Amino acid sequence: MNLHEYQGKQLFAEYGLPVSKGYAVDTPEAAAEACDKIGGTEWVVKAQVHAGGRGKAGGVKLVRSKEDAAAFAQQWLGKRLVTYQTDANGQPVTKILVESCTDIAKELYLGAVVDRSSRRIVFMASTEGGVDIEKIAHDTPEKILKATIDPLVGAQPFQGRDLAFQLGLEGKQVTQFAKIFTGLAKLFQDHDLALLEVNPLVIKADGDLHCLDAKINIDANAMYRQPKLKGFHDPSQDDPREAHAAKFELNYVALEGNIGCMVNGAGLAMGTMDIVNLHGGKPANFLDVGGGATKERVTEAFKIILSDTNVAAVLVNIFGGIVRCDMIAEGIIGAVKEVGVKIPVVVRLEGNNAELGAKVLAESGLNIIAATSLTDAAQQVVKAAEGK
C-alpha cells in the first residue's frame, strides 16, 4: 500500500526526522489558511498523488502569496494529474500539501528496500539526489552506496556515519545523517515497509540536513499487523477495476494491451502473458482467479476484463486440479451468457477432465474457441484480437 507524501512525512516526524512544516488541505480556502499558519513569504504547494514526476507535470509549484496557493489548489483539486508514472488517465488529486519553502544547497538520495537476494533491508545512498534513482543505477551504478541491515541488531550509527563520509558530508552533517539513517531504519522495520525513499534528502543553505520528500510503500501482506496505517489508505488512488477485483478475491492488474487474460494461478498467469507476448500479442491485464474458478468468480472476472474497452479478445487458461475442467467449462459458458460477451473467447483447459471440458465448450453453441495447447491458445487469441 502506497502512502501520500504528507502521510509519509507524518511518520517521519513521529521518528524525530527533520521535515518541513506543512498542512494537507482539500479546499482553496484551506490552502490560503495554511500559508498563514506556516508563516513566511514563500511556500511550496504539491498535488498529492501516488506517482512520481509531479514537478515536471505541473503538480509542484513555488508560490509567493496565499492567493497563488489558493489558485493552485483550485487548479488541481478534483482534477487528474498525468505523469510519466501514471497511465493516460492520470491520478485524481484530492489533497494539496502546503509547505514552508526550503533553501537548498545540495540534493542527496537516501532509500531502502527489502533485498531478496540477501534477505535483508538494504539502504542506498547517492550524491545524485532529486533524480530518478533507477536511471542512476543503470547509467552510473558506482554512484550508489549501500548498507545492509543485520536483522538481529538493526541499523547501527557507524553504518550511517560510514555512508555520510562517503557522501562527502562533514561536521554536524555526519551526526545528523546517522540519526536520519537509524530513524528511517527503525521506521522501516516497525511499519513493515517494502520501500522507503527520501528523494531528495537536502543540505540546506545553513548546512543542516532535511527530508524534503517522502515515498513509502507498505508490504500488503503485513497490513494485518499495521491497523493504524490502514486508515492511511486512499481509495481514490486505486484502479477501480483492481479495487472491484479485490472484493471477489481476484488478483487483477491493468496493463495496456488488447488481449484479456483470465488464468488460475499467478505463475500460470505470468507464463500465459509471456507466451501471448511471444506470439506478437499484448496482454490487457494480469488476472488470477485463484484455485476456486467458480461461475460467480469467472463471471466477475469477465465483467472486469470487459470493462476495459481496449480488449479485443479474451484468453482463458485454466488448469483443472481439485476443480474439474468440465465444471470450469460450465462456469465459463454461464459467465459468457450472463455477461453477454461479444468478442472472441479462446479457452485452454488442461488437467482433471480436460477432454470432457473441451467437449462441453464445443457443444455450447457459443463463440468460444477451444485451444488444444498453450501455444495454440496464444496463436488463436492473437489472431482473434487482430480480427483474422
Curated annotation (Swiss-Prot):
- Cofactor(s) needed by this chain: Mg(2+)
Q: Which GO terms describe its molecular function?
A: ATP binding; magnesium ion binding; succinate-CoA ligase (ADP-forming) activity; succinate-CoA ligase (GDP-forming) activity
- GO biological process entries: succinyl-CoA metabolic process; tricarboxylic acid cycle
EC number(s) reported in the record: 6.2.1.5
Could you say which residues bind ATP here?
A: K46, G53, R54, G55, E99, T102, E107
The ATP-grasp domain is annotated at: 9-244
* Co-factor remark: Binds 1 Mg(2+) ion per subunit.
Task: Give residues annotated as binding substrate.
Answer: N264, G321, I322, V323
Looking at the UniProt record for this protein, which Gene Ontology cellular component terms does it annotate, in alphabetical order? cytosol; succinate-CoA ligase complex
- Enzyme type, top EC level: ligase
Tell me which residues bind Mg(2+): N199, D213
Instruction: Determine the domain of life of the protein's source.
Output: Bacteria
> Sorted alphabetically, which Gene3D superfamilies does this protein's record hold?
ATP-grasp fold, A domain (3.30.1490.20), ATP-grasp fold, B domain (3.30.470.20), Succinyl-CoA synthetase domains (3.40.50.261)
**Alphabetically ordered keywords of this record:** ATP-binding, Ligase, Magnesium, Metal-binding, Nucleotide-binding, Tricarboxylic acid cycle
Write out the function statement from the record: Succinyl-CoA synthetase functions in the citric acid cycle (TCA), coupling the hydrolysis of succinyl-CoA to the synthesis of either ATP or GTP and thus represents the only step of substrate-level phosphorylation in the TCA. The beta subunit provides nucleotide specificity of the enzyme and binds the substrate succinate, while the binding sites for coenzyme A and phosphate are found in the alpha subunit.
Q: How does it assemble?
A: Heterotetramer of two alpha and two beta subunits.
| Identification of the protein by name | Succinate--CoA ligase [ADP-forming] subunit beta
The lineage is: Bacteria, Pseudomonadati, Pseudomonadota, Gammaproteobacteria, Pseudomonadales
